[in-house]
Amino acid sequence: MTYPNLLDRFLTYVKVNTRSDEHSTTTPSTQSQVDFATNVLIPEMKRVGLQNVYYLPNGFAIGTLPANDPSLTRKIGFISHMDTADFNAEGVNPQVIENYDGGVIELGNSGFKLDPADFKSLEKYPGQTLITTDGTTLLGADDKSGIAEIMTAIEYLTAHPEIKHCEIRVGFGPDEEIGVGANKFDAEDFDVDFAYTVDGGPLGELQYETFSAAGAELHFQGRNVHPGTAKGQMVNALQLAIDFHNQLPENDRPELTEGYQGFYHLMDVTGSVEEARASYIIRDFEKDAFEARKASMQSIADKMNEELGSNRVTLNLTDQYYNMKEVIEKDMTPITVAKAVMEDLGITPIIEPIRGGTDGSKISFMGIPTPNIFAGGENMHGRFEYVSLQTMERAVDTIIGIVAYKG
């Protein structure tokens, strides 16, 4: 189905800079997200028909569309995030490419281009309307496509009361891209049987498995002496960092793994002879494998300290989120419903693990099973990001189908 306000709504959203800031200590991490929620989203939530609309101190804008059929007793939530990734989001100037011809798309005057030779996903979209960047910013389809789709679904349901639906709760939240947005999510206040994050990629994505995730911060304490007289005295902290890294499995890196394979990812290393620091992220799907990866890092640190005769390696491990499969597989209703709706719409569900996490990873462990469904974005988090309007329309169809489902 086509929705006349969907494209303009999406274009309005992406032109607002809502980039999050991992170094901030506030919630949300940037004032622009507060402004976007209070000045743009909340007024529109009221206009499209949501009731009891409010903004919480945790950064979530919340609203409800009451059920219009007493036989549909479920309460279902839909959640998308306001923030965009760590890439330029100031001055987003989207290009709308109607009836895409399957060829190269020049991204404004930036000198960058979307070429099917480099981005095979473009081969799916001839004849469709694509929204791209101008090459100087990201687009923000992650996750403003999700926000626009949820808002459009509510607007359509309000305008078409003949479509019977259950109670719907909507939540637009902050700081998903920096991994803290759902930390303060109020599951008791949201009060639904299950929910969906509308934060996926291509048409048909339906995901209920995520990584389990941890962060590792390492400090290496060296001893700096003049290199000319260093033998037997110098301890080079940078060399310690190298030695630590070289003891990790050589092939367990993001660029060498796929599917259900986990990894260690060195994010940053800084320092000097005197001291050095390294930051890693640890990812795996199975709980035992996840715990084994953390234990392996601790074992390497302990072994190095034993060999050095002092505590020159300090490791701090912090769990970040867990594989939501552990919660959702106990009651697969949200997957069964979404899968049936997609199939009824002629959409082939793509049920694959997310090699990442969503807000649903945390919200599921708060008591609300929250799998992820497609929102349409491709090449997210950078200048090559784009989205198909037709895929966004199908996401709206899917949301409407889920809340009207009687199975």
Curated annotation (Swiss-Prot):
Protein species of origin: Streptococcus pneumoniae (strain Hungary19A-6)
Entry keywords, A to Z: Aminopeptidase, Cytoplasm, Hydrolase, Metal-binding, Metalloprotease, Protease, Zinc
CDD domains, sorted: M20_peptT
Compartments, record wording: Cytoplasm
Matches recorded under PROSITE patterns: ARGE_DAPE_CPG2_1 (PS00758), ARGE_DAPE_CPG2_2 (PS00759)
Gene3D superfamilies: 3.30.70.360, Zn peptidases
Organismal lineage: Bacteria, Bacillati, Bacillota, Bacilli, Lactobacillales
GO MF entries: metallopeptidase activity; tripeptide aminopeptidase activity; zinc ion binding
Name under which the protein is recorded: Peptidase T
